[in-house]
C-alpha cells in the first residue's frame, strides 16, 4: 500500500530549508491548553517497595519532588527546545498515580492565554517529572523504563486534538 501524501510542511524550516522560529505575531490570542503524559515502569519488587513506602525514597517524597521538577521544566521549556516561544504560563497541574501494578502515570496539563500552544511545555513537564521519578528511585534499580511520553490533548489553536481535560 503506498504511503499517504500530505501537503503539511515543517513549520520550523523556511523556504530555503533553514531552521527558523515561527512568527506568531499575526495569530489570535486565545486560551490554550495541552495535556501530556509519561509513564515510569518499575520492576515488580521496586513497585511493591514504593507502594509500601507511600512513594517515598531516601531522597524524600517522590511525587512532590516530581511535581516541583516538572513545573520548573514547564516554565523553562523555551530554554530547552530551540524554537519554542517563551510563554506566560497561567497554570500547570500534575496528576501522578499508579496505572497498574508496576506503572506510575504522570499527567501534566498546562494553560496560558497567548498566540501559540503549550504542547511542548506539557510534554516537557511530563518528561522531566518522569526523569525525576527515575532519579529518586535509581538506588533501588536501574531496570526502570520511561515511556511512552505522548500528547493527550491540546485546545485553543487551529485544531483541537484529543479529549478536553
Curated annotation (Swiss-Prot):
Principal EC category: lyase
Reaction catalysed by this enzyme: (8S)-3',8-cyclo-7,8-dihydroguanosine 5'-triphosphate = cyclic pyranopterin phosphate + diphosphate
Name of this chain's protein: Cyclic pyranopterin monophosphate synthase
HAMAP family membership: MoaC_B
GO biological process: Mo-molybdopterin cofactor biosynthetic process
Pathway: Cofactor biosynthesis; molybdopterin biosynthesis
Signal peptide residue numbers: none
Entry EC number(s): 4.6.1.17
Protein family membership: Belongs to the MoaC family.
Keyword match Lyase: yes
InterPro entries, alphabetized: MoaC, MoaC_bact/euk, MoaC_sf, Mopterin_CF_biosynth-C_dom
Gene: moaC
Gene Ontology MF term list: cyclic pyranopterin monophosphate synthase activity
Residues the record lists as binding substrate: 83-85, 120-121
Organism, scientific name: Xanthomonas campestris pv. campestris (strain B100)
Pfam family, one: MoaC
Domain of life: Bacteria
Function: Catalyzes the conversion of (8S)-3',8-cyclo-7,8-dihydroguanosine 5'-triphosphate to cyclic pyranopterin monophosphate (cPMP).
Active-site residues from the entry: 135
Quaternary structure (record): Homohexamer; trimer of dimers.
Record flagged with keyword Lyase: yes
Keywords: Lyase, Molybdenum cofactor biosynthesis
Amino acid at each position: 500500500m503506498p504511503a499517504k501524501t500530505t501537503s503539511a510542511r515543517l513549520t520550523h524550516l523556511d523556504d530555503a530549508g533553514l531552521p527558523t522560529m515561527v512568527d506568531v505575531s499575526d495569530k489570535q490570542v486565545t486560551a490554550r491548553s495541552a495535556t501530556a503524559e509519561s509513564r515510569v515502569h518499575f520492576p515488580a519488587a521496586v513497585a511493591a517497595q514504593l507502594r509500601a513506602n507511600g512513594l517515598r525514597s531516601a531522597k524524600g517524597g517522590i511525587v512532590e519532588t516530581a511535581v516541583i521538577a516538572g513545573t520548573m521544566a514547564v516554565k523553562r521549556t523555551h530554554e530547552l527546545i530551540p524554537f519554542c516561544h517563551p510563554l506566560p504560563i497561567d497554570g500547570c497541574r500534575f496528576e501522578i498515580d499508579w496505572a497498574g501494578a508496576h506503572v506510575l502515570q504522570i499527567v501534566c496539563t498546562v494553560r496560558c492565554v497567548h498566540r501559540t500552544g503549550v504542547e511542548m511545555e506539557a510534554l516537557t513537564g511530563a518528561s522531566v517529572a518522569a526523569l525525576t521519578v527515575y532519579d529518586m528511585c535509581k538506588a533501588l534499580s536501574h531496570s526502570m523504563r520511561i515511556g511512552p511520553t505522548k500528547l493527550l490533548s491540546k485546545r485553543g489553536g487551529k485544531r483541537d486534538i484529543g479529549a478536553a481535560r
